[in-house]
Amino acid sequence: MASDSLKKRKPKVNRNEDVKRGRHEDQEGRYYSEEAEVDVRDPKEDYQLYKDTCLDLQRLMSEIQELKSKGSRDSALEIEEKKVQSCVHFMTLKKLNRLAHIRLKKARDQTHEAKQKVDAYHLQLQNLLYEVMHLQKEITKCLEFKSKHEEIELVSVEEFYSKAPVAISKPEITSTDPHQQTLSRLDWELEQRKRLAEKYKECLASKEKILKEIEIKKEYLNSLQPQLNSIMQASLPVQEYLSMPFDCMHKQYETARHLPAPLYVLFVQASAYSQACDRKLVVTIEGNVEEARALFKPPEDSQDDESDSDAEEEQTTKRRRPTLGVQLDDKRKEMLKRHPLCVTITLKCKEGSTLTLTFYFLMNLNILTVKVKILPAFELSTAISAGDLLNPDLMLSCLYQGDDGKTTPNPANQYQFDKIGILSLSDYISELGHPYIWVQAMGGLHFPTDQPQPAVVADNALSANHMEKTIKLLRTRLLSRLSLHRQFASLEHGSIPVSLECQSFFPAKVISRLTKWNVITYEDYLALPYTKDVIECGLAKETDQYFNLLIERGTAKLNGVVVLNPGYCAVPPVFSLCLNWKGERLSSNDDNIRVMESEVNVYYKELCGPPPGFQLLTNQIQRLCMLLDVYLETERHDNSVEGPHEFPPEKICLRLLRGPSRTKPFKYNYPQGFFSHR
């Protein structure tokens, strides 16, 4: 059966081949008929036909696959029929594809034609807009045109008719004709100006007469000056006797006129504070007045000088071209140039010691600097550990917290330094002085860090607000350093000075003795194993001073390091301890060492003594000696060792140990004289 069906299909194949031979001849005729057919057919119906044809194809393919999978011989005819149906559907899909391409081409052609029309309309619109803009410019020019007479400010029309004579105003003509009215108003303006010119000449003559009278009176006043000077000279002894130096004050005020604004504000506010609150504060002005006067030249003169200096520079460059290094050095010197005048403030203490502050103004950097000089009232003993206490470079460091005076407070200076190769102002501080922030405040200068300003104005109110507090801090700093100097001299000799007012803080008998007191560096302090907690808390900084102490009793040795803040005694010293006795005992492995540290670091207010509390450091060291006695005397004795105790108990303790940490009674109770726990 299958072979018969194949034989029957052969003539069909031949007919299809005949059709293919004539396909090329009939192609053009069908192309045009299909193009016309596109306009008649509905695209939606073609789309639906496409979907139905695809579904039929899918159905036929699945049926053919099922028949082939069965493999029966009777299904061959049915498969061939379904193949024929599939070919018909493929032809339908090809036709739909051709129709879709024809529609796409027509849509593109229509879109292109519409776009050309839109472009043509847009070009016409642009041309019209350009013409409109051109016309608007011409209209604006016409409207902005002003005649010369419009620049003249004429009197109002009402005033013109009320004040102008009839011969000029001509109301019968000008009231109806604006042009004639304007001409008449201009004539009246000319008449008024002629009258004012005559008055001006009369005023000039009167001015010349008055100037001559002024010159005569000036000559008379100048003739009185020598007589007044002689009277002032004669009154000098009286002024000195009455402590009323009016002549010196007058000269100071005359010199103050040549001070720059920040130094002038500092001079005025310090003088006012001295007169009102502190008679022991002396304010003077020093420096070259002639050089200061030369700086205050009119702008025109300065421009002429600049042009002359430029010409001189051109001549010098023709003769000799300096090297780049010399040019940079000259620029640095010019950048760091100080004003010829300076203000000196002398603080006197009750005991007679004086602190002299000299304030300078760096003109190009727009900042103030200060230099310090200390004159003690008594001769100080030489103490190695007190070498930096009265060092002028460290004396005023951190007067306010964080203000070490090593960097410029003006943010704009860094850009100036970059141009001339200055890395940091700290390299020139020894020559220029320290630019502390409180120094800027005393001069009325304030530099906001968020938005740098090129020109900063000196503020009197800012200076007045900082003056009293700063003067008190300066005097306190001087007294505290002098007191520490005396204490260090005693500590180096193993003696702890305790004043009479503070002797009640300690028992009458303290056996432990201070055997060593010396200064150490910041790096040495960081290397110690028992200072880690203080460093992590941020209580040790490079600006602080560091000291090492050793307290001994028998075989026990208590090592301690002290952090001394520049703001002593407002900021108390911080102690870290290490006991070498039967091993190394630190606060990390011995709770009693930790309690001893808290006794001097936490309860320091008990040891301040009478105000201002300059004896705090020595009282803390004396308490450490007392605490070491308690620690050793309350330690249990090993009964297996024969002989007397190394540290016999001499302190009265209500209770030797307390709590699971077995802490010792370190609190001294006066006047009972016993020790207890806190």
UniProtKB/Swiss-Prot annotation:
Q: Does the keyword Cytoplasm apply?
A: yes
**Residue ranges annotated as motif Nuclear localization signal:** 7-10
Q: Does the keyword RNA-binding apply?
A: yes
User: Which keywords does UniProt give here?
Assistant: Cytoplasm, Differentiation, mRNA processing, mRNA splicing, mRNA transport, Nucleus, RNA-binding, Transport
Acidic residues biased stretches: 301-314
User: Looking at the record's lineage, which domain of life comes first?
Assistant: Eukaryota
Chain residue ranges for the region called Disordered: 1-35, 294-329
Question: Subcellular localization, per the record?
Answer: Nucleus; Nucleus speckle; Cytoplasm
**Pfam families linked:** FmiP_Thoc5
**Bias (Basic and acidic residues):** 14-35
Cited function: Component of the THO subcomplex of the TREX complex which is thought to couple mRNA transcription, processing and nuclear export, and which specifically associates with spliced mRNA and not with unspliced pre-mRNA. Plays a key structural role in the oligomerization of the THO-ddx39b complex.
User: Subunit structure of this entry?
Assistant: Component of the THO subcomplex, which is composed of thoc1, thoc2, thoc3, thoc5, thoc6 and thoc7. Component of the transcription/export (TREX) complex at least composed of alyref/thoc4, ddx39b, sarnp/cip29, chtop and the THO subcomplex. Interacts with thoc7.
What name has this protein been given in UniProt? Answer: THO complex subunit 5 homolog A
* Species per Swiss-Prot/TrEMBL record: Xenopus laevis
Source organism lineage? Eukaryota, Metazoa, Chordata, Craniata, Vertebrata
User: What gene name does this entry carry?
Assistant: thoc5-a
